Amino acid sequence: LTLRVAVVGGGPAGSCAAETLAKAGIETYIFERKLDNAKPCGGAIPLCMVSEFDLPDHIIDRRVRNMKMISPSNVEVDIKLDNPDEYIGMCRREVMDAFLRDRAASLGAKLINGRILDIKITENGKKPYVLSYSDFTDGNNEGTMRTLEVDLIVGADGANSVVAKAMDAGDYNYAIAFQERIRISPDKMEYY
């Protein structure tokens, strides 16, 4: 009997889960709807995560050792790392996510450029779950409707999780990430 697992969401959590499953010889499918998705969140990663994700140097765009954080109420916090070997790695999420997905795929996980539309949860888990999805692999913006039966589902599809909704995990009342771009005059900037 071969265990089949769908990992919904191909960001860091989903890709690392898929990598672990594939290493264990489990038939693994990674679903990601936007393979080139540039996201504002998660671009700053601490040194411990660089080693935990086993990221190569080319994934890290910049190594930040000094920064200033300013809250909306104008409270400032200066962060300085004294050890020259320590840094916060700045990376582009679309680059890091693609690297992690590709690594999982190289171990046998099957990457599906698709969007989950529906999940049929079976009674008592005695039958496989049925995922209905739009497959964008052929480049068609509408996608081709497909289904896949799996034994387990890993929900790594973010704040508006289709998996969480399907299992009635409840609603989220708080934003967990945001991005704001502001223009600052050069005399207000500090360079390190």
Protein language model annotation of sequence segments:
Residues 1-5:
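Extreme N-terminal starter segment of soluble prokaryotic enzymes
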Residues 6-10, 19-41:
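Glycine-rich FAD pyrophosphate-binding loop
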Residues 10, 103-192:
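Predominantly flavin-linked oxidoreductase catalytic cores and closely associated redox partners
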Residues 14-15:
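N-terminal Rossmann-fold NAD(P) dinucleotide-binding loop
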Residues 19, 23, 51, 102, ...:
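Short, well-ordered alpha-helices that flank and scaffold nucleotide-derived cofactor binding pockets
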Residues 33-72:
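N-terminal FAD cofactor-binding segment of flavoenzymes
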Residues 82-102:
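Short beta-strand to alpha-helix junction loop
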